[in-house]
Amino acid sequence: MSSSCSGLTRVLVAVATALVSSSSPCPQAWGPPGVQYGQPGRPVMLCCPGVSAGTPVSWFRDGDSRLLQGPDSGLGHRLVLAQVDSPDEGTYVCQTLDGVSGGMVTLKLGFPPARPEVSCQAVDYENFSCTWSPGQVSGLPTRYLTSYRKKTLPGAESQRESPSTGPWPCPQDPLEASRCVVHGAEFWSEYRINVTEVNPLGASTCLLDVRLQSILRPDPPQGLRVESVPGYPRRLHASWTYPASWRRQPHFLLKFRLQYRPAQHPAWSTVEPIGLEEVITDTVAGLPHAVRVSARDFLDAGTWSAWSPEAWGTPSTGLLQDEIPDWSQGHGQQLEAVVAQEDSLAPARPSLQPDPRPLDHRDPLEQVAVLASLGIFSCLGLAVGALALGLWLRLRRSGKEGPQKPGLLAPMIPVEKLPGIPNLQRTPENFS
């Protein structure tokens, strides 16, 4: 999300000019009638209402008989204040030459609008909203003009003014001030938000470029429930639902993170469950626990949501229903076994050690596949060992049968080159 804040666009300049009448010799009323506005340290011109332009009038402060400006000033029905300050605020009265009161004007001082601060957030893949706040307190009545358009690719000048790219008005929320909502946005498109602040002394605009995947922040999960697990003094079962504002679709899922802590413990433990429930296995026995959940897009677009309201739960301290003995039989051994089990399930003091009985979530098919793999590797190992043993026995047996026969392993040295053997020449004398 990038921000580019500058002057007014061409469309907003025309609207702001109609609203801001500071360029007129006698500004029109902006807001309540009979009120004019000025900026501290700047000159201000007041016009006497109810008289025609150029009519000489006298000016007084309301409740003060001292003359501020006489009819011979040459300014007609106008009063010019060179540099106004906070003491100059108040009501001014103008009178014609015949002493008839022409009217009253109230002067209020303030400042032109500064560039507003704008931020946007999307709670799903189709809608997003933008909020803003003034850059500075102007002290004057203020209006906001909001619009948006779809950004085009660089060089696509023909599409810049296309009806398919806007601009369109961003409807302001009547129930929540300083907020407008865009419906039916395209997830992979980039939009430019235009927020213009206008008051009697001027206007200022902020342009904000947004992408839905970067401003996505779901609402917190709803319906969080925390329940004990009967027979397990170290476990709690938490469940929740998707936020109502998230349109759950097969391609747009949420992932969750869960935090929990015992009462009077400030540190949170965090896990990332799969699905809409989680069994906590390392709670502190006998203590209530606070649990909260937040959500995020499954592919990590945007940011994590705010935390849901905390829900509380206390681990179970009783036995499983099917483990409760039949007390009518009165067997001593059964009573001793139950007492021993109660001692193991409900220790005298809370234990911080993990539960030694973990949940078995393994799939039976996975167990069969593991056993089959172990069997195959065992057979291969036995076959390789048997083959190696057979080769070793064969080589040992062939070495005991006699001298080594010429073959691949026989030395490749001529007989006449062996040391200690005379070199016999095949001559007639040798044959005789």
Curated annotation (Swiss-Prot):
Secretion signal: which residues? 1-23
Report the locations given in the UniProt record.
Answer: Membrane
Q: Where are the transmembrane segments?
A: 373-393
Q: Which UniProt keywords apply?
A: Disulfide bond, Glycoprotein, Immunoglobulin domain, Membrane, Receptor, Repeat, Signal, Transmembrane, Transmembrane helix
Query: Which intervals of this chain are the motif WSXWS motif?
Result: 304-308
Q: Which residues lie on this side of the membrane: Extracellular?
A: 24-372
Which PROSITE patterns does its entry note? Answer: FN3, HEMATOPO_REC_L_F3, IG_LIKE
What is the membrane topology here?
A: Single-pass type I membrane protein
What S-S linkages are listed for this chain? 48-94, 120-130, 170-180
Family matches, as SMART domains: FN3 (SM00060), IG (SM00409)
Q: What Gene Ontology molecular-function terms does this entry list?
A: cytokine receptor activity
GO cellular component, alphabetical, reads: membrane
The segment(s) forming the Fibronectin type-III domain are 112-219, 220-317
Q: Carries keyword Signal? A: yes
> Domain of life of the organism in this record?
Eukaryota
Ig-like C2-type domain location: 27-110
Where are the annotated glycans? 127, 194
Region: Disordered; residue ranges are: 151-170
Which parts of the chain are coiled coil? Answer: none
Membrane-side (Cytoplasmic) residue stretches: 394-432
Indicate the principal place this protein occupies in or around the cell: membrane
| Function, as annotated | Receptor for interleukin-11. The receptor systems for IL6, LIF, OSM, CNTF, IL11 and CT1 can utilize IL6ST for initiating signal transmission. The IL11/IL11RA/IL6ST complex may be involved in the control of proliferation and/or differentiation of skeletogenic progenitor or other mesenchymal cells.
Protein family:
Belongs to the type I cytokine receptor family. Type 3 subfamily.
| Subunit (UniProt) | On ligand binding, forms a multimer complex with IL6ST/gp130.
Q: What is this protein called?
A: Interleukin-11 receptor subunit alpha-2
To which species is this protein native?
Mus musculus (Mouse)
Protein encoded by which gene: Il11ra2
